[in-house]
Curated annotation (Swiss-Prot):
This is NADPH-dependent 7-cyano-7-deazaguanine reductase. The lineage of its organism: Bacteria, Pseudomonadati, Pseudomonadota, Gammaproteobacteria, Alteromonadales. It holds the Pfam family QueF. GO terms for cellular component: cytoplasm. It comes from the Bacteria. Keywords: Cytoplasm, NADP, Oxidoreductase, Queuosine biosynthesis. It catalyses: 7-aminomethyl-7-carbaguanine + 2 NADP(+) = 7-cyano-7-deazaguanine + 2 NADPH + 3 H(+). Homodimer. The active site is at 194 (thioimide intermediate), 201 (proton donor). It comes from Shewanella sp. (strain MR-4). GO terms for molecular function: preQ1 synthase activity.
Length: 286
């Protein structure tokens, strides 16, 4: 596994992003504000090709600050649950997504269906892939749940840590081939940094797998090693998936991370080779 070369250092695909630059906020609808980043930028570095991905899944976004004007000019608010297929050509850059959603604020739409259809059309075009959008109206806010990730939390392991550089080699020799298990583990200690701005990205991650039992201390050290790693949320989750398959020989694997929101958006990448995402419920920190 290659983990020394930085695939992003001179990537022209990142040069035009509004992320990390001063920007004006537009209050009237403008689909051109959306910016995509090719998934291949990260996948090439971890030896993945679009034709032979070892997982399926989605980037599950929650938009908490969706607002527009109805036909009479009265402001409306809602939450949007957005799922972007793992097969899309691009991921969507989050600051551009925020700016795009802000452009709805002073724009009239005839009804909520028109808002939903506009979101699907524009996001699908930017991502070059399938997108679904569910709009949650205020009358349903009361049934929105706060949950914990399934499984056993590994964060209480009493370990000493002095190295915070990303290192997948923590997973080397981390399994016991004599113990074949099916278990679900989670951690709230995932932290990485924005690829462009280096701002901290705080997350929780669930790992559900079948295969040789993974040493939990080594797994926790591996997850902590993301602490100073600069990469987008979606890319971190795919990297975790690939590393676990490579080092731990999981026969079945799901990696699901939920990151805290920024700019009214949270991103929750889900990758699995045997199951599909269920209902999206936020965690306490989201």
């Amino acid at each position: 596994m290659t983990h020394n070369h930085d695939p992003y250092s001179d990537a022209k695909e990142l040069a035009g992003l509004t992320l990390g630059k001063a920007t004006d906020y537009q209050a009237e609808y403008d689909a051109s504000l959306l910016q995509g980043v090719p998934r291949s930028l990260n996948r090439n570095a971890i030896n993945l090709t679009a034709e032979s991905l070892p997982f399926h899944g989605a980037d599950i976004w929650t938009a908490y600050e969706l607002s527009w004007l109805n036909a009479k000019g009265k402001p409306m608010v809602a939450i949007a649950d957005i799922q972007l297929s793992h097969e899309s050509q691009n991921l969507i850059e989050s600051k551009s997504f925020k700016l795009y959603l802000n452009s709805f604020n002073q724009t009239k739409f005839d009804n909520i269906d028109a808002v939903q259809k506009t979101l699907v059309q524009d996001l699908s075009e930017c991502a070059q892939g399938q997108v679904t959008v569910k709009i949650i109206e205020p009358k349903s806010f009361g049934i929105q749940r706060v949950v914990e990730l399934p499984g056993t939390c590994i964060d209480d392991l009493d370990i000493e840590v002095s190295d915070y550089d990303f290192n997948p080699d923590y997973l080397e020799n981390s399994t016991d081939d004599k113990q074949i298990v099916a278990e679900t583990l989670n951690s709230n200690l995932l932290k990485s940094n924005c690829l462009i701005t280096s701002q901290p990205d705080w997350g929780s991650v669930m790992i559900r797998y079948q295969g040789p039992k993974i040493d939990r201390e080594k797994l926790l050290r591996y997850l902590i090693s993301f602490r100073q790693h600069n990469e987008f949320h979606e890319q971190c989750v795919e990297r975790i998936f690939v590393d676990l398959k490579h080092y731990c020989h999981c026969t079945k694997l799901t990696v699901y991370a939920r990151y805290t929101r920024r700019g009214g958006l949270d991103i929750n990448p889900y990758r699995s080779d045997f199951e599909h995402p269920g209902e999206s419920h936020r965690l306490a920190r989201q």
